[in-house]
A protein has these predicted regions:
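S-adenosylmethionine
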Residues: 1-169
């Protein structure tokens, strides 16, 4: 995983302490669009925690509504597509990429994924709902086989999006 912000990398490292040490290659600070070029097709799992508008976290950070404006969305979506494409390139055949945002905005979630997939024949969607169910403490009420969109009023979380993609070749 690559991150430009060292403080976010530290948060990810803390979260990964719950995972067996031999299951994690590491957290790298850098630009995910280019840093992964050195490892093309080498990772089993990659998580893209994409920079986004943060609209899904408004309940916890109401002041963030003043940090973004609608004109920011196209540039963020372009960056998200670049990061997702680079992550897929860095993943070996059979490996998984998790694309995650804390935004429910379609331009930052499904449309980004759909756009990237339209240009690739080596990737398929995986069942994100089953993956979430396998680690959930209680039944989250998700539709099987789909991307996952969590909502504050339904799931008691931020509005987060997850798509799982499998590299087929």
């Amino acid at each position: 995983m690559t991150l430009l912000q060292p403080h976010r990398a530290r948060l990810v490292e803390q979260a990964l302490r719950a995972v067996p040490a031999d299951a994690v290659e590491g957290v790298v600070v850098g630009d995910g669009r280019t840093i992964l070029e050195r490892t093309e097709g080498g990772f089993d799992r990659v998580m893209v925690d994409a920079p986004c508008t943060g609209l899904g976290a408004l309940r916890r950070r109401p002041e963030s509504r003043w940090r973004r404006e609608p004109a920011d969305v196209p540039a963020l979506a372009r960056l998200q597509r670049e990061l997702l494409g680079a992550a897929l390139d860095a993943t070996r055949p059979g490996g998984l990429v998790a694309y995650v945002t804390c935004s429910p905005h379609l331009a930052e979630t499904r449309l980004v994924v759909d756009d990237v997939l339209a240009g690739r024949s080596d990737v398929e969607r995986a069942d994100a709902a089953s993956a979430v169910r396998s680690v959930a403490l209680e039944e989250p009420g998700l539709v099987p086989g789909t991307d996952v969109q969590l909502w504050p009023h339904v799931h008691g979380t931020d509005a987060m999006h997850l798509t799982l993609l499998r590299r087929t070749r």
